[in-house]
Amino acid sequence: MKYIEWLNIWLNNYIKPSAKERTYIRYEQLIRTHIAPKIGGNDVNDLTPIVLQSFVTELLNSGNLKTGKELSANFVNMVISVMQNSLKTAHLVGIANEYVANKIKRPRAKEKQVECFSCQEQKKIENYVLNSGKDKLFGIVLCLYTGLRIGELLALTWEDIDFGKGLLFVSKTCHDGNDGEKHIRITDSPKTVNSRRVIPLPKQILPLLKGIKRRSQCEYIIADGDKPVFVRSYQRTFELLLKKLNISHKGFHSLRHTFATRALECGMDVKTLSELLGHKNATITLNRYAHSLLEHKVDMMNRLGKLL
């Protein structure tokens, strides 16, 4: 059996019924754009460790199909995961004589530098948003004070806020997709079990949200009139805002990093921060924000030194 034939069977019979829609779409795209054109025509049993490793090396050297830039190790590792999962199933059901994809050597992913906004940049962003008269932009401030991911933010509906108790409930996320004909927005369960969480809102945020709710024409908190907002559209809005304010470009996720950094600077303990961010455990938080924690320790020790 040709590998592409097996991949289609695997996608529709083993992935689509059990995985999140987002996972299915991602796998289908990786297969269509990267795997099928190169090794889809090979017989499943001709995919030796050397053939698979050569394909991985070619991927690393070929670059992004749109931009031409180098493909990240994380992206290539996603492709490897698709190959390994599909070929493992092929072996289990008797399509492949043996399972050899576990012999692929994965590229080492570079550790991403955590980027956050300075206090001055944060204040500049907040002042612009709060004085813009555009309720749609308020999501930027909300992320600075809750650490929400962009998908979690844009999936929020008014039912997710308990104004009486001042609580925000994170129970879903959203992402952009394509149904083959048009751009669509897909709402899904959160990234992980721990991503389901309750976030107490700062008391200064509540009256601002109440004002937006009074003016709102949509069930979603962040909206374009009576319509929800696409993830890429909101990212682009944020990029343009930074450009207008003459602040160096940072991804939308930097708002989440900024929240975490400010929380640590204010003395929040790591366990509480970990729960607010929806991390699996505090170790993840410690590893990701080690630099911020060190700066906080230096500041605390310098304050202590002033007692001498």
Model-derived regions, located:
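Basic, Lys/Arg- and aromatic-enriched nucleic-acid-binding interface segment
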Residues: 69-73, 77, 92, 96-98, ...
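C-terminal catalytic core of tyrosine-transesterase DNA break-rejoin enzymes
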Residues: 92, 141, 145, 151-152, ...
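Catalytic-site neighborhood detector that most strongly recognizes the C-terminal catalytic loop/helix
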Residues: 112, 174, 206, 277-302
